[in-house]
């Protein structure tokens, strides 16, 4: 709702954060106006799931993964176990159900993202100061987990110690619920589920999900960031890429914004179309997929600036999608002086490529070479040496000449 900061719900309770200052100046003290008070203002009155699905298809997407619930604990679906949901409060609509129907109607694959596991600590900053978070009857704010000696549990400590038993049981109940209600083909998770204390619970979830998928006669995917082998889930790199071809399929999840995930009033930091296409090509050349985030407004519309970027990506894929969809890695991902950035949280700035930077993909006996910058009319592919199979013909996608 505030359209000011991605982790507004947490940082509005941190007295050392600029978000706290902004909140107090704009909405008043956190004792009187807490995060819960934004929810009735969230109406999604212009939300059109069919328009969203058409846009995503036009952008060239093959699968769509709405957020069922983020760290803040507000569910965008009809939950029996969480009264803080979009059917009972705010929009009075089952956002997930409506999107699922629209996405499937466009012939796209439907997944869900859940961050319920992070809710147990997300509002713990509010326990340090007088705030509505200290009212433990407000279940939206989760466990407010604290360290044994009193200080509020930080994100870094959560990385070390995980959650608690009650929050893990709570998480599992919610996962069973969205599996049963929506039958997603993909479930994406953030980092807490990868911590050792969470893993026993997560294995129970995976067994339930995979066994149900057999009954549905569907192939399903689980995305995690660490803690589990590539043979049981699909590895995900947040806002980053791999530096090599990975033997198993993997995924980059990133945002259309250089910094934001959620809607921000200042959209000057949108990534360029070229930036996103370069990343897509590099990711696919290394056996990966791209999950691209957009930040809608509270009224349910996707800003026109973001729509424009998506449509331009779609236009490029209409011509060049043959080198992307249903392809496999070649014997090497590419060549050229710029190997690109690798690792988590490394993609905010665009890599500077030259016409010597090329990425490879294959389909059957066809090798696709995508040049990451405009050339002077000539391209030299050094990887096609005499040791490689002979080249029978060369053509450019979108051009009938050879």
Where are the model-predicted features located?
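Mature catalytic domains of secreted/periplasmic carbohydrate-active enzymes
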Residues: 1-402
């Amino acid at each position: 709702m505030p359209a000011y900061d991605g982790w507004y719900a947490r940082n509005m309770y941190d007295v050392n954060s600029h978000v706290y200052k902004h909140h107090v100046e704009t909405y008043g003290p956190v004792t009187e106006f807490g995060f819960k008070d934004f929810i009735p203002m969230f109406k999604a009155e212009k939300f059109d799931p069919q328009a969203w699905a058409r846009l995503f298809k036009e952008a060239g997407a093959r699968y769509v993964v709405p957020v069922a619930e983020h760290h803040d604990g507000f569910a965008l679906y009809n939950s029996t176990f969480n009264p803080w949901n979009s059917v009972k409060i705010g929009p009075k609509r089952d956002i997930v159900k409506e999107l699922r129907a629209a996405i499937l109607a466009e012939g796209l694959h439907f997944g869900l993202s859940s961050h319920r596991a992070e809710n147990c600590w997300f509002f713990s900053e509010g326990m340090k100061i007088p705030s509505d978070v200290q009212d433990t009857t407000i279940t939206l704010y989760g466990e407010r987990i604290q360290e044994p000696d009193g200080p509020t549990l930080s994100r870094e400590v959560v990385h070390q110690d995980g959650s608690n038993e009650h929050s893990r049981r709570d998480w599992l109940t919610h996962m069973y619920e969205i599996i049963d209600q929506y039958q997603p083909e993909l479930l994406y998770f953030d980092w807490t589920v990868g911590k050792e204390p969470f893993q026993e619970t997560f294995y129970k979830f995976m067994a339930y999900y995979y066994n149900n998928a057999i009954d549905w006669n569907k192939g399903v995917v689980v995305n995690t960031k660490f803690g589990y082998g590539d043979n049981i889930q699909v590895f995900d790199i947040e806002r980053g890429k791999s530096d090599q071809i990975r033997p198993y399929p993997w995924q980059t999840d990133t945002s259309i914004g250089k910094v934001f995930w959620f809607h921000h009033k200042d959209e000057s930091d949108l990534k360029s179309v070229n930036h996103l296409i370069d990343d897509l090509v590099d990711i696919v050349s290394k056996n990966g997929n791209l999950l691209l985030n957009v930040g809608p407004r509270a009224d349910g519309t996707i800003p026109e600036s973001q729509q424009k970027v998506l449509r331009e990506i779609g236009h490029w894929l209409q011509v060049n999608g043959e080198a992307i969809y249903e392809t496999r890695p070649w014997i090497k991902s590419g060549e050229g002086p710029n190997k690109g950035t690798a690792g988590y949280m490394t993609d905010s700035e665009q890599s500077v490529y030259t016409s010597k930077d090329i990425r490879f993909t294959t389909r059957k006996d066809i090798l696709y070479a995508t040049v990451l910058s405009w050339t002077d009319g000539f391209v030299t592919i050094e990887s096609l040496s005499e040791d490689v199979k002979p080249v029978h013909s060369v053509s450019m996608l979108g051009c009938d000449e050879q």
